[in-house]
A protein has these predicted regions:
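Bacterial N-terminal signal peptides that target proteins for export
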Residues: 2-10
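Hydrophobic h-region of N-terminal signal peptides that target proteins for export
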Residues: 14-23
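Beta-barrel outer-membrane channel/assembly domains of diderm bacteria
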Residues: 22-88, 93-99, 319-333
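Surface-exposed coil loops of outer-membrane beta-barrel proteins
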Residues: 41, 104-172, 186
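Flexible, solvent-exposed loop segments that connect beta-strands
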Residues: 43-47, 119-120, 237-240
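Short, glycine/acidic-rich beta->alpha junctions
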Residues: 53, 86-88, 130, 163, ...
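Exposed, low-structure sequence patches enriched in small/polar residues
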Residues: 54, 93, 144-150, 154-160, ...
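Secondary-structure transition into beta-strands, especially the periplasmic turns and strand N-termini
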Residues: 68-69, 103, 145, 260
Length: 334
């Protein structure tokens, strides 16, 4: 069945490419490589020790319909080092893109590339293994900043299937040296046969106000503070008083000079109730300090190393991350 499905997808893709070729301006292509090394030395109840080590390769080909519009198809594959070869299934990519100076809109199954939400709402481990959004995303850019609107489907919607999706908004607005960041996230999870449906909803939202110093000895220096509110409700689980709610202060600090940076957050209050958020925030008293070495930063290749210290409810843990990201793209004229 799987073989037949892939054959059907391949045949349909070839047909679409052939038809689009007659009406498009250029054949466009994209290629990428990601290397991930994430070693976590966690000792508390909220996190467990693990090492994630893998490489993902991706390729896309499509057609530039006009100056603003394009359709692309392709896929990516993750090799998790230490696992058996071909332990993971390929991830297909098929999407429409509209892009101008004010809007970048994508619909279909498209690479995440840049996280929409911070780790408190959406842990980075998800992006390692689920590199695509499936739905639609619009990034609006304006003179004062940008706003992102996301709708991400996770499963089919019919009787007998789980129904899961994420919807949210995030962005930043600048006022000279001041800025405001906003985030809203809603995750819906329903499952069961018709008439016997259980629903588990969760989400969060937050606002931060910050100040960024410019024209100083540092290349970048910013600080912000605000709050994060989360909730979790389950219509079937009678062991909890639903909905669960949390409210906590959330502060950030970032400083960079050339290839050296320091990135820090402090979350204190009630623990989060987000199954897809970073579990360390569930302790309610969490700080993270990342020392960063930006080893390479060119238009096509980025490489960085992070040594991360985690303060989890009175206990200090650490982790290390190495990340290499390469992106290439071009056109093949007709």
């Amino acid at each position: 069945m799987t073989r037949f499905s892939f054959r059907s997808i391949f045949a349909t893709s070839i047909l679409c490419i052939t038809l689009l070729n007659a009406f498009s301006q250029d054949v466009i292509w994209k290629a990428g490589f990601d290397f991930i090394a994430d070693n976590r030395e966690f000792t508390t109840y909220y996190g467990y020790p693990e090492t994630i080590l893998g490489s993902r390769v991706s390729a896309e080909i499509g057609f530039q319909i006009d100056t603003n519009q394009a359709i692309l198809e392709g896929g990516s594959y993750l090799v998790e080092h230490g696992e058996k070869m071909f332990a993971h299934e390929p991830v297909l990519t098929m999407y429409y893109q509209y892009k101008n100076n004010f809007l970048n809109f994508q619909a279909g199954c498209f690479p995440i590339e840049k996280a929409t939400f911070p780790k408190v709402l959406y842990t980075d481990s998800l992006i390692y293994y689920r590199p695509n959004y499936q739905g639609a995303r619009a990034v609006f850019t304006h003179n004062l900043g940008e706003q992102t609107i996301l709708f991400d489907w996770h499963t089919q919607v019919r009787a007998g299937y789980c129904e899961k999706f994420i919807a949210g908004i995030s962005g930043i607005t600048h006022f000279k040296n001041f800025f405001i960041t906003d985030m809203f996230y809603y995750r819906h999870h329903a499952e069961g046969e018709r008439g016997k449906k259980s629903v588990a909803d969760n989400g969060g939202w937050g606002l931060n106000a910050g100040f960024e110093l410019k024209n100083t000895w540092f290349d970048s220096l910013s600080v912000s503070t605000g709050f994060v509110n989360t909730w979790y409700a389950n219509s079937k689980d009678t062991t909890i008083v639903s909905p669960l709610r949390s409210l906590a202060s959330y502060s950030t600090f970032y400083i960079q000079k050339k290839c050296i940076g320091l990135d820090a957050i402090y979350y204190v209050g009630e623990g989060t109730h987000l199954p897809w958020g970073d579990p360390l925030y569930r302790c309610g008293n969490y700080a993270r300090i990342d020392g960063i070495l930006y080893a390479l930063n060119t238009p096509n290749v980025e490489a960085s190393f992070r040594w991360c210290m985690h303060y989890v409810d009175g206990v200090w843990d650490n982790s290390q991350q190495i990340y290499i990201r390469a992106r290439l793209n071009g056109k093949m004229g007709k």
